[in-house]
Amino acid sequence: MRSARVVAVCGPTASGKSEVADELSALLTEAEGVWVPTVVVDSMQVYREIPEITNQARSRPAELVGVVPVTREWTVAEHRRRARAAIEGSGAGAAVLDAGTGMYLNATVLDIPLAPKVPREIRALAQRAAAGAANPRREARRLELELYGAPERGSIWEGEPAYELALIYLRPERASLDEAIARRSSRIARRGLADARRLQDLLEAGARVNPSVLGSIGVRELLSHLRGEISLPEAEETISVRTRHLARRQMRWFDKLARTLSGRARLVVSPSPEDPALRKALHSMHDIIGA
């Protein structure tokens, strides 16, 4: 186990986890007397040209936000390397994670094997071959490794915690979460157009934008709107629907992570940032994770 203390704040999009993470890092900074960083663990917030679509605004500076251009491919392995460097480089010996991407969180806080990076050509071939599978993404990844001649990685759930770890899991009720997602989708549709125009300019100039960015929630819909294919209200509704589906997947992942970490990490599961039990936990977290 590495010599650092980590509090991971996770939850579905629009659950309020970023606000909780920033509040906690500020509280720990005050208690420690030295800066405790917030490290963002999100596969899309790393891209600097789409700050509105990916909700990068926050109350205090954070690591791994807007750090690479949309023309760059970003991987789980790169995120783990950069996140762990930020954690272990903290003068406080502690960090708060703001985590929305489950695989990136597992890779950061658990000692698990990561599959090797596969060339783009092999990845495309595997994706075509797996198109008719029951789970195309999983089958494509299996085929990638087979075609590349690499062994399948071990379980991404069985690794031991890499740090002294506490997990705060924001798990809202579905109705309240869906309302928050609708508000966020409206905001993205209004404020994200500048991001979409920036991407449109790059594409028209011949730039090769990362396909993961082009297919992401908000980007796909707003680019479609700029091309005249759908109205802005239609874009907003599609963003909302896709975000609700994403939130369900995130919750299934974090449910499993919480079960996996039971007995191996300190767990706080809360329905909202205003939950009295969570408020108490935030203000006692310095004592919980140790000085």
UniProtKB/Swiss-Prot annotation:
It holds the Pfam family IPPT. Substrate binds at T13, A14, S15, G16, K17, S18. Residues 42-45 are annotated as: Interaction with substrate tRNA. It catalyses: adenosine(37) in tRNA + dimethylallyl diphosphate = N(6)-dimethylallyladenosine(37) in tRNA + diphosphate. ATP binds at G11, P12, T13, A14, S15, G16, K17, S18. The record marks T101 as: Interaction with substrate tRNA. It is an enzyme of class 2 (transferase). Keywords: ATP-binding, Magnesium, Nucleotide-binding, Transferase, tRNA processing. GO terms for biological process: tRNA modification. Its cofactor is Mg(2+). Catalyzes the transfer of a dimethylallyl group onto the adenine at position 37 in tRNAs that read codons beginning with uridine, leading to the formation of N6-(dimethylallyl)adenosine (i(6)A). Monomer. This is tRNA dimethylallyltransferase. It comes from Rubrobacter xylanophilus (strain DSM 9941 / JCM 11954 / NBRC 16129 / PRD-1). The gene is miaA.
